[in-house]
């Protein structure tokens, strides 16, 4: 596809969003949060759909895994600080606050209550597809492979995958070789994490 000009790799972050927004490309795989940017572009006629899948694969489509930013609470602080953190997290988790955040940014609401509140408000009727990221995450009961990722050195592992994909996109490696190399390199990273945390 790349050789025929049907696929263009725009980079690891959100550079593809700009190409889509300008009309340079017809399709983009993007974060749920890209909806806010696309909505601001009044000249852009766009819609949002399920991630493509092979319908001949047993159980397809499965849930996509959650990504995006996280809030972390670190150890070693004073009890009063944790009380403040707890109040802040409780505030962020309120259905009304989550609905506002979700409808403004496009990011997925963090509770079922906030999703239901958004649905009942008519937001999804007025913004078709805005609930697609929620549907992709909750399509089925989670499997071992769709519960989300939690492992040490995640960022380094993701970088390996990105490097190997870039080698395929540039025509430097075939998909099988890149996948095998990604597995080997990522496993090496995991072994180092395991050794450092015994």
Model regions and ranges:
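Long, aromatic- and glycine/proline-rich binding clefts that accommodate carbohydrate-like moieties
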Residues: 103-163, 167, 197-198
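Secretory-pathway/luminal and periplasmic proteins that interact with or process carbohydrate-rich
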Residues: 27-29, 97-100, 187-193
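Extracytoplasmic/periplasmic substrate-recognition and gating elements
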Residues: 1-8, 39-108, 141-146, 173
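Short, charged, surface-exposed loops that flank catalytic or proteolytic processing sites
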Residues: 167-180
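Soluble non-cytosolic domains of exported or imported proteins
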Residues: 14, 79, 83, 151-155, ...
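A short structural micro-motif
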Residues: 19, 55, 143, 184-189
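Short, low-complexity disordered leader/linker segments with a strong preference
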Residues: 177-180, 184-198
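Extracytoplasmic ligand-binding clamshell segments of periplasmic binding protein
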Residues: 1-41, 83, 178
């Amino acid at each position: 596809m790349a050789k025929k000009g049907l696929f263009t790799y725009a980079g690891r972050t959100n550079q593809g969003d700009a190409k889509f927004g300008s009309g340079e490309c017809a399709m983009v795989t993007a974060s749920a949060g890209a909806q806010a940017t696309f909505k601001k572009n009044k000249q852009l006629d766009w819609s949002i759909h399920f991630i493509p899948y092979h319908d001949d694969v047993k159980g397809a489509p499965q849930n996509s895994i959650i990504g995006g930013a996280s809030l972390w609470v670190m150890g070693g602080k004073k009890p009063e600080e944790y009380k403040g953190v707890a109040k802040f997290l409780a505030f962020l988790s309120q259905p009304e606050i989550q609905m506002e955040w979700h409808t403004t940014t496009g990011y997925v609401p963090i509770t079922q209550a906030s999703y239901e509140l958004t649905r009942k408000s008519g937001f999804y009727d007025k913004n078709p597809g805005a609930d697609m990221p929620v549907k992709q995450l909750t399509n089925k009961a989670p499997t071992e492979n769709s519960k989300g990722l939690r492992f040490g050195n995640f960022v380094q592992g993701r970088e390996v995958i990105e490097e190997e994909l870039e080698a395929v996109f540039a025509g430097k490696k075939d998909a099988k070789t890149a996948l095998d190399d990604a597995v080997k390199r990522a496993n090496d990273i995991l072994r180092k994490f395991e050794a450092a945390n015994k």
